Design a protein with these regions (language model features):
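Generic structural signal for well-ordered alpha-helical scaffold segments
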Residues: 67, 71-79, 99
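Phosphate-coordination/substrate-recognition cap region in phosphate-metabolizing enzymes
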Residues: 1-46
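A short beta-strand-loop-alpha-helix capping motif that often carries His-Thr
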Residues: 87-98
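Short glycine/proline- and acidic residue-enriched helix-loop micro-motifs
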Residues: 45-65
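Acidic, low-complexity terminal tails and accessory targeting/binding regions
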Residues: 17, 28-40, 79-84, 101-142
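Short glycine-rich phosphate-binding loop at a beta-alpha junction
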Residues: 1-4, 85-89
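Alpha-helix N-cap/helix-start capping motif
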Residues: 5-9, 92-93, 117
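Amphipathic, non-transmembrane alpha-helical scaffold segments
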Residues: 1, 5, 63, 67-71, ...
Length: 142
């Protein structure tokens, strides 16, 4: 399963398996702040975004909206993951939301963790519940 963005699809294709896209795993929309360094985002906007998960930057998406769509996508994968391995290729913000889902915590945890590009987070299921097995694993890219 892949984000529809080209860079994610190219990574997914490297597994040599058919790639299914799911719009819900697309990166968070930063709106007018897309590509802008954190240091260049006005402090009021940055503080609102960090404190209020429902805050929507101009032209963007709230963390609450991201969290809702990723949790729904993860819930939809539970049945398939009970009978086979499922690989999701996505982006930092959706993967942090998936980790929050697996841990049963709110999206606010995303501000307290770091994911490297091309890192792996492994979520397995035990007794029908998600269990985070690895986080930010990078051994495959060294």
């Amino acid at each position: 399963v892949s984000s529809p963005l080209k860079r994610a699809q190219q990574t997914a294709e490297a597994f040599g398996l058919p790639v299914e896209t799911d719009e819900r795993f697309i990166e968070l929309s930063y709106g007018v702040y897309e590509g802008v360094k954190h240091a260049d985002v006005p402090s009021e906007v940055w503080n609102n975004w960090r404190k209020d998960f429902g805050y929507v930057p101009e032209g963007g998406e709230s963390l609450a909206a991201l969290d809702g769509r990723v949790r729904a996508a993860c819930n939809d994968l539970i049945e398939r993951a009970s009978t086979s391995n499922v690989v999701v290729v996505s982006h930092v913000s959706p993967m942090k939301a998936a980790v929050a889902w697996a841990l049963g915590v709110d999206i606010g945890i995303s501000w307290n963790c770091h994911l490297d590009h091309a890192s792996v987070c492994r979520i397995d299921f035990r007794d029908g519940r998600p269990v985070l097995y690895t986080f930010n694993e990078t051994a495959q890219i060294t």
